[in-house]
Amino acid sequence: MDLSINERLVLRSLDLKEVTAKDLASAAGLKPEAAVQGAAMLAEKGLATLRDEVESEYVLTDEGRKYAAEGLPERVIHDALPADGITLNDLKKQFPPATVNIAMGWLRQKGWAKFEKKDGDMFLLPQKADASADEKMLAAISNGESQKGFDAKVIKDLLKRNLIELRETKTKFVKITDSGLAVKQAGIEITEEIAQLTPEMIATGSWQGKTFRKFDVSLPVQTEYGGRKHILRMGMDAVKRTLIEMGFKEMEGPMVDAEFYVNDLLFMPQDHPARTHWDQFNLKEPKYIHSLPQNLVERVRRVHRDGGSSGSLGWNYEWDETIARKLVLRGHTTSLTARYLAKHSKPPQKYFSVSQVFRNDTIDVTHLLEFCQIEGWIMDDNLSMKELMGTFKEFYSRMGITVLKFKPTYNPYTEPSLEIYGRHPKTGRWIEVGNSGMFREEMMEPYGINSTVVAWGLALERLMMINYGYTDIRDLHGPLCDINFLRSVPVVWQQ
């Protein structure tokens, strides 16, 4: 049988009599922890038995040791009481208030003093005070005497006064088994083993001819949880890689932005329900953006009022720049698209972003107050909805989702518009994973863009729900997310 050097030393030192780990370590010439480890390994192989025996005893606390040496406060006060008594006020002049306060209750409880009211003050008259049970117990513990027969009530009182505490001492006992005895009788050879190969040994060649300890790498070990990316961060990285592979460039921009970029440039009227505090988060301080590009401001004003030169009638109201300057937490990353269209107005263009958005929604299995949106848009001449749907099929197929469904819908800033649905692998339910469409001419008018722009906003969490089979978005994101689930998600390495 293959045994380590420590196992051999321990086995050779064992006999039929059970011994403590401390005595075994001394006999084997090992440190106690090394002897226990060797005995435990022998026990796993059936060559020895290892058991724990716990002994409990009461020991004095720091305060208990002080009182055992100097006397309990009630004993100190009693012994200082004059035979004809003393007032409480005079007593407090002789002893610290804390000592007097502790002693008063115990003097009364033990009957060591008689208390009388006299001239508006408390008068203490000493009584007979033989050694009490708690004093005897403190002395016995202090002197290391046997604790058998200790009175339970006295122990409870001393514990309550924090004068003693229960201390448990664990002793390990080791005994050889019949199998271990057979191995021992067959002869145990003690050969020095090396546990670690060092650079110096390699350089000098001193490792040659040495015996190295064998390690069983198949033995179970404690799981170590190191730092790792959150499942959504891994999902974001995968989406970014996929869109970059498809020829897109990434957009970046502020999470706090003016309503001008979040709503007004998207041809969303200022009285739209989605622009109220019921749906979006407004900033209290600062409340407004410092400035807006005035060339765009005037064009947006005209488009909202009468459609400008887009051929539309607009929304037929007086647009308010003050409302447009209000700062909000962006409810979609289309605010980035609104910013980038002003800088990249000549086709062809392909941009995307994957970032957080914030909506004042009711939290349920598919909605959160904060989630990650996959924003994207393509600008080119003569684009159609066919190219848009083809982009989705290509993107989602690369993300592992091949079954999609499209449904016409309405959006203030796209026409025509489509909702995208993916089928959940477990429930079979169709889940809306995004919204899309072709930007309206009213939205393109302020930029002076004559080319077609198709765009979308997709939900990363819902994509992940389909990929991983989860039915509740809160299982992926937020305080209800299971830590064991996060630890068990495979880490996918990609260059």
Curated annotation (Swiss-Prot):
E.C. code: 6.1.1.20
Binding-site positions, L-phenylalanine: T334, Q373, I374, E375, Y413, F439
Places the protein is found: Cytoplasm
Top-level taxon of origin: Archaea
SUPFAM superfamilies assigned to the protein according to its UniProt record, in alphabetical order: Class II aaRS and biotin synthetases (SSF55681), Winged helix' DNA-binding domain (SSF46785)
Catalysed reaction, written as an equation: tRNA(Phe) + L-phenylalanine + ATP = L-phenylalanyl-tRNA(Phe) + AMP + diphosphate + H(+)
InterPro entries linked: aa-tRNA-synth_II, aa-tRNA-synth_II/BPL/LPL, Phe-tRNA-synth_IIc_asu, Phe_tRNA_ligase_alpha_bac/arc, Phenylalanyl-tRNA_Synthase, WH_DNA-bd_sf
Enzyme class: ligase
Key words, A-Z: Aminoacyl-tRNA synthetase, ATP-binding, Cytoplasm, Ligase, Magnesium, Metal-binding, Nucleotide-binding, Protein biosynthesis
Biological process according to GO: phenylalanyl-tRNA aminoacylation
GO molecular function annotation: ATP binding; magnesium ion binding; phenylalanine-tRNA ligase activity; tRNA binding
Cofactor names: Mg(2+)
Co-factor binding comment: Binds 2 magnesium ions per tetramer.
Binding site for Mg(2+): E415
GO CC, alphabetical: cytoplasm
HAMAP family in the cross-refs: Phe_tRNA_synth_alpha2 (MF_00282)
Family of the protein in this entry: Belongs to the class-II aminoacyl-tRNA synthetase family. Phe-tRNA synthetase alpha subunit type 2 subfamily.
Subunit structure: Tetramer of two alpha and two beta subunits.
PANTHER family: PHENYLALANINE--TRNA LIGASE ALPHA SUBUNIT, PHENYLALANYL-TRNA SYNTHETASE
Name the record gives this protein: Phenylalanine--tRNA ligase alpha subunit
Organism: Methanocella arvoryzae (strain DSM 22066 / NBRC 105507 / MRE50)
Species lineage: Archaea, Methanobacteriati, Methanobacteriota, Stenosarchaea group, Methanomicrobia
